[in-house]
Swiss-Prot record:
UniProt subunit comment: Monomer.
Protein name: GTPase Era
Bilayer topology annotation: Peripheral membrane protein
Record keywords: Cell inner membrane, Cell membrane, Cytoplasm, GTP-binding, Membrane, Nucleotide-binding, Ribosome biogenesis, RNA-binding, rRNA-binding
Region (G4): 130-133
Gene responsible for this protein: era
Region of interest: G2: 47-51
Function statement: An essential GTPase that binds both GDP and GTP, with rapid nucleotide exchange. Plays a role in 16S rRNA processing and 30S ribosomal subunit biogenesis and possibly also in cell cycle regulation and energy metabolism.
Membership in a protein family: Belongs to the TRAFAC class TrmE-Era-EngA-EngB-Septin-like GTPase superfamily. Era GTPase family.
Domain Era-type G: 13-180
Region (G5): 159-161
Protein species of origin: Bradyrhizobium sp. (strain ORS 278)
InterPro entries per record: G_ERA_dom, GTP-bd, GTPase_Era-like, KH_dom-like_a/b, KH_dom_type_2, KH_sf_prok-type, P-loop_NTPase, Small_GTP-bd
Length: 307
C-alpha cells in the first residue's frame, strides 16, 4: 500500500512488537499463528531461535511487525550470551513488548527474573499467558494476578498459540496499540527474512527433530547458493557446520540415512513455502570452534560478544 493509498483509506498504524520470554514458552509458535504462515522455526528443544526473526501481520488498517526473540536464560557460552543480548535489544527497540509466560510453569525463577528486567523497558508491556489449555482456570487467574502484582501490564491475554485460542483477540489488540504511521513493508510480505535464510532455518529445524542431546546446539546451517532454474524449480546448496568429526558422522548417519531424511523433510517444506519444486543438496563440514567465529555470528544475525 502506497502512502497515497493509505491516506485515502484513513489513518494507518504500524509498529514493532517484541515477544520475550523463557526458552520454549511458545514465542515462535505464536508468531507463526499471528502471521498465519510459517516464518520462524519451532522445536520442543529450548533455544531454537537464535536471532531476531520478524513476522509481518496486517490487521485492518494496522501493520504489526512481530519480533521473535531468542529465549532468555542464564547464558554460559559465547553464543548463549549473544542470543540473550539480542533478545533484550529487541525488547528495548520495539514499540510494544509482549511478555510470554508458560501457564504450566507459572512464575518460576526464570519467569520472575524476566519480568523484573522487563520493568526497565520503557514501552508498554502486555502479559501473554500461553498454553492455557493445560492448566485449570483457577490457577490461571492466580498466575495472572501474581504477574500483574510484580509489573503493571497494560493488557493481559490468556491464549493457546498451538490451538489458536485467544490469538485473534491478541492480534486485534496489538493492531489498536501500535502507533499511528505508514506501513514499513508491502502488504503481501510476511517476513523480512530472505528466503535463503528461512530455508537454512528449516533445515536446522529438521536437525533438531532428528538429533538429540547437545548436537543440535553445536551445529549451524548456511545456504551457500540459491539458483532459480529455467524450468521454474530452485536449486539450493546448504552446509551444515559441526565442531568435530564424530558429530559429522552422527549427522550423516549409517549409510547417509540421517542426512537423507533431514534433506527430504527440509526439501518438502521449502517447496511448500516457495510453491515450486526444490532440489536441495546438503553438505556436512567440520569447523572447529565455529561458536567463536565472528563470521558465523554475522551469518546468524547476531552481534559477536568480545568477552
Amino acid at each position: 500500500m502506497t502512502a497515497e493509498q493509505q491516506a485515502g483509506q484513513g489513518a494507518t498504524r504500524c509498529g514493532f512488537v517484541a515477544l520475550i520470554g523463557a526458552p520454549n514458552v511458545g514465542k515462535s509458535t505464536l508468531v507463526n499463528a499471528l502471521v498465519g504462515s510459517k516464518v520462524t522455526i519451532v522445536s520442543r528443544k529450548v533455544q531454537t531461535t537464535r536471532a531476531l526473526i520478524r513476522g509481518i501481520v496486517i490487521e485492518g488498517q494496522s501493520q504489526i511487525i512481530l519480533v521473535d526473540t531468542p529465549g532468555i536464560f542464564s547464558p554460559k557460552r559465547r553464543l548463549d550470551r549473544a542470543m540473550v543480548t539480542t533478545a533484550w535489544s529487541g525488547a528495548h527497540d520495539a514499540d510494544l513488548v509482549c511478555v510470554l509466560l508458560d501457564a504450566k510453569k507459572g512464575l518460576d525463577d526464570e519467569a520472575q527474573a524476566i519480568i523484573d528486567k522487563a520493568a526497565s523497558v520503557a514501552h508498554e508491556k502486555i502479559l501473554v499467558v500461553n498454553k492455557v489449555d493445560l492448566v485449570p482456570r483457577e490457577k490461571l487467574l492466580a498466575l495472572v494476578a501474581a504477574a500483574n502484582e510484580k509489573l503493571a501490564f497494560a493488557r493481559t491475554f490468556m491464549i493457546s498459540a498451538l490451538s489458536g485460542d485467544g490469538v485473534d483477540d491478541l492480534r486485534r489488540a496489538l493492531a489498536e496499540m501500535v502507533p499511528p504511521g505508514p506501513f514499513h513493508y508491502p502488504e503481501d510480505q510476511m517476513s523480512d527474512a530472505p528466503m535463503r535464510h528461512l530455508a537454512a532455518e528449516i533445515t536446522r529445524e529438521k536437525i533438531y527433530s532428528h538429533l538429540h542431546q547437545e548436537l543440535p546446539y553445536q551445529s549451524t546451517v548456511e545456504t551457500d547458493s540459491w539458483t532459480e532454474r529455467n524450468d521454474g524449480s530452485i536449486r539450493i546448496e546448504q552446509t551444515i557446520f559441526v565442531e568435530r568429526d564424530s558429530q559429522r558422522k552422527i549427522v550423516l548417519g549409517k549409510g547417509g540415512a540421517t542426512i537423507k531424511s533431514i534433506g527430504a523433510q527440509s526439501r518438502k517444506e521449502i517447496a511448500e513455502i516457495t510453491g515450486v519444486p526444490v532440489h536441495l543438496f546438503l553438505f556436512v563440514k567440520v569447523r572447529e570452534n565455529w561458536g567463536d567465529d565472528p563470521d558465523r555470528y554475522r551469518e546468524m544475525g547476531l552481534e559477536f560478544p568480545r568477552e
